[in-house]
Regions:
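Short alpha-helical
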Residues: 18, 39-40, 62-63, 87, ...
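Short Gly/Pro-enriched turn/cap motifs at secondary-structure boundaries
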Residues: 11-13, 110-111, 131-133
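Metallo-beta-lactamase
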Residues: 95-98, 125-209
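Active-site HxH/HxHxD metal-binding segment of metal-dependent hydrolases
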Residues: 38-122, 205-208
């Protein structure tokens, strides 16, 4: 795509500093919001004259979905999430908001279930869905040439926790090795927490994977 029209923003939001991302097409005037912990992300969109086209979720934990309902109520946009994590949106025990948030989080809206290989587009942006279970059974990553949004699957020199309900360490490591580590080494990795990294760097220095 013409990168001169690409908008990419990272905003650590919420009590756990969850990285919320906006990736948009200036010419189209629309953007995807990825893992909104709060609705503060909407202020950033307005500054860039962008409207949300959809909310994309890498998984269903409460620190990644806290702003979804407010965004959906304001803009009536769909919510993309893997079918194995849909139940997290209505269950504060599963999404852990009973423990990590002042009030339990539930989300209602137009759900679009994603699967391996799906393409989600916004203007010239074309994101491919990779199923990467382990942190949750419905964990996914969103990839386009040059970058990948990985949620809590992979971090800078670390990997996502698997000691929560339905976590699976072996599945997580397998997904990282067979899905993410097959991407070009110079692919930028945008995780759910902490700083960005690159695939090649993690293949060399990440002791967990």
């Amino acid at each position: 795509m013409d990168t001169s029209n690409l908008v990419l923003m990272r905003m650590p939001l919420g009590p756990l500093g969850t990285n919320c991302y906006v990736i948009g097409d200036k010419e189209q005037g629309e953007a995807f919001i990825i893992d909104p912990a709060t609705t503060e992300v909407l202020d950033a969109l307005k500054k860039h004259n962008l409207k949300p086209k959809a909310v994309l979720l890498t998984h269903g934990h409460g620190d990644h979905i806290g702003g979804v309902q407010g965004i959906v109520d304001a803009y009536d946009v769909p919510i993309y999430i893997h079918h194995n994590d849909v139940k997290y949106l209505s269950d504060p025990e599963l999404n852990l908001s009973n423990y990590s948030n002042p009030t339990p989080i539930t989300v209602k809206g137009r759900i679009i279930e994603v699967h391996e290989g799906d393409h989600i587009t916004c203007g010239a942006i074309d994101l491919t869905v990779y199923e990467t279970p382990g942190h949750t059974p419905g964990g996914v990553c969103y990839y386009m040439p040059g970058l990948v949004f990985v949620g809590d699957t992979l971090f800078n020199q670390s990997v996502g926790r698997t000691d929560f309900v339905e976590g699976d360490y072996d599945a997580l490591i397998n997904a990282i090795k067979t899905k993410l580590y097959t991407l070009p080494d110079n692919t930028m990795v945008y995780p759910g927490h902490g700083p960005e990294t690159q695939i090649g760097y993690e293949k060399q220095y990440n002791r967990f994977s």
